[in-house]
Amino acid sequence: MVQLAEVSWTDAQKLFKECDTVILPVGSTEQHGPHNPLGTDHLIAAAFSKAVGDRTGVPVLPVVPVGISEHHRQFPGTLWVPPDVFRDYMLSVALAACSHGARKVLIFNGHGGNTPALIEVAGALRRDYDVFAAVLMTFPPGVDGHAGSKETSMNLYYHGHLVKMDRAVDQTQDTHLGPLQMTGIGRLGPMEFPWDTIDLTPTGVLGGAGKKIVSTTATRKTGEEIMGPFTEEVVRLVEAIKAADPDELLSKPHKAG
């Protein structure tokens, strides 16, 4: 495994000649309840990327620690950048790696709020620069709840010394927006509105309107049970992408008739 930030330029030169694939981890610095560190998303993204890089030999770029998190802005310590700035920055980082020989960029994303912008970045790389790019969330489907039991368990697995379980809370989400009744996060029946976390929870533990999110039952063992099989699955996928001819992963021209 190679963390790009830990090698010299001469080592990097050799590295890019030997491997045309890179992992670009990204997350956020935002509140994750009173018990989890603000860096939860980017810390998990970095740790997961390292685990996959260790197994596949794919270079891991430095983690991008700040993303699209303005909806958590009322909680002290949360940092964010506007979506257009984030898109431009992520594209620029990816293209910098490509200037040294990367042809496949795998964006390992730890924060759901980044996803729409990252899909646009991946599309631009594939469409405009002949670079295959894909976006992966750094946790498997079914890990629901912001700062809930599963995410907290993942934190305990990767960096338990940063988690303060004595502060963990179980939080039932608010369902009221003034006189109106919410039917989901940011939903009023068939209508959606731009919500902030504070609309739903005073603690930052978040799930869905009217839903109780539990964080007090989190354990390191649960985190290992979540991330162990998922790591194996992603390792197999990354190895297949690494072995593929990048030109075969690009869009094909339309052949009329």
Regions found by a protein language model. Name each.
Residues M1-K104, G112-G257:
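Extended, histidine- and acidic-residue-enriched regions that form the cofactor-binding/catalytic faces
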